[in-house]
Amino acid sequence: MSASQKEGKLSTATISVDGKSAEMPVLSGTLGPDVIDIRKLPAQLGVFTFDPGYGETAACNSKITFIDGDKGVLLHRGYPIAQLDENASYEEVIYLLLNGELPNKVQYDTFTNTLTNHTLLHEQIRNFFNGFRRDAHPMAILCGTVGALSAFYPDANDIAIPANRDLAAMRLIAKIPTIAAWAYKYTQGEAFIYPRNDLNYAENFLSMMFARMSEPYKVNPVLARAMNRILILHADHEQNASTSTVRLAGSTGANPFACIAAGIAALWGPAHGGANEAVLKMLARIGKKENIPAFIAQVKDKNSGVKLMGFGHRVYKNFDPRAKIMQQTCHEVLTELGIKDDPLLDLAVELEKIALSDDYFVQRKLYPNVDFYSGIILKAMGIPTSMFTVLFAVARTTGWVSQWKEMIEEPGQRISRPRQLYIGAPQRDYVPLAKR
């Protein structure tokens, strides 16, 4: 971040309130729009800014992820998402997000070995699972168990020590697939499957999800490749609701396990992490291709309350760069599994075709997003809808941890404290109960 310059001069923005003016510096990032630094605004003019939901506010500096929603660009540490998804392993992306650069061979081998050594859970956590009902939602189990990890691994709770931060980061990223898979097994009444040192991150998750004690399990390479892609595509997405929650909690100095649990809780909200499940429900409700025109008409009717799920994005005003990769992956998975003429996929393709050619959606820039196809892929792989958001959390933990570390290590980091515009009652005097 640096001060913006125009014709050799530092750029400023003049803000006037009630006849008084103040010059606010304009800051430039590596990419993206400039921002106005308004930190001195209250002192100079006695006012705050009002931006509900922080939609137009940069709350932090970050070197991790860049999004250009107008152009459909997503970069991790400068690398386009399509290049990473096509060429990298998820472990490489973990290293990249945490450390800023892709690893060389020696670094990669050391890193993956360390990651593998942290996949096991404390044996007492098996007993912790028994406290949940068998019909508990897997996200409830995931959130509760991750939040409890600080009780099982208290040795790294002092985050002022860099080595502790690194240890906590590795533990969280390595253990969350195990917790997630065990949450699924617990709800199914099946025996827990332990992680294997001979499998990579994506393969291990599939093994712990679908292997059984009674027979050997061989990971399908096509499904492993698809899982690797899904993990990479969901690894980080800048300052979204759950990431901002992690940063807000982390700014208090809370232990990293509690911070990630807070992020999981935020992700659980249907407006954030449940979009791919909503797509499946929408397609099931449509039923068949012949019903699409009537459904589209309902979507256009503001009074119907019907929404087109899987299209449009809070940030992307162009095609979601992750959606094209998901579309390709969807076809690969269905072909590998021998699923032909899948009714949901046929519906999805036809719905996409109609929506992309309809002026109503084109003018509003409602393009398919990553959730449009991911739900179909996960369903085909045998992952139940109750686990969709859990898988999202597994992938996003890398981003959360990276963002948390970046925030903690930022010079001058302090507790986050948003302001408000108070619209309640003015000051008034207490009236005794008998006189009310």
Swiss-Prot record:
Single GO cellular component annotation?
cytoplasm
Keywords of this entry: Allosteric enzyme, Transferase, Tricarboxylic acid cycle
Q: Which organism is it from?
A: Acetobacter aceti
NCBIfam families for this protein: cit_synth_I, PRK05614.1
Active-site residues are 313, 371
This protein's name: Citrate synthase
Q: InterPro entries in the record, alphabetically?
A: Citrate_synth-like_lrg_a-sub (IPR016142), Citrate_synth-like_sm_a-sub (IPR016143), Citrate_synthase (IPR002020), Citrate_synthase_AS (IPR019810), Citrate_synthase_bac-typ (IPR024176), Citrate_synthase_sf (IPR036969), Citrate_synthase_typ-I (IPR010953)
CDD domains attached to this UniProt entry: EcCS_like
Q: Any other comment in the entry?
A: Citrate synthase is found in nearly all cells capable of oxidative metabolism.
Originating gene:
aarA
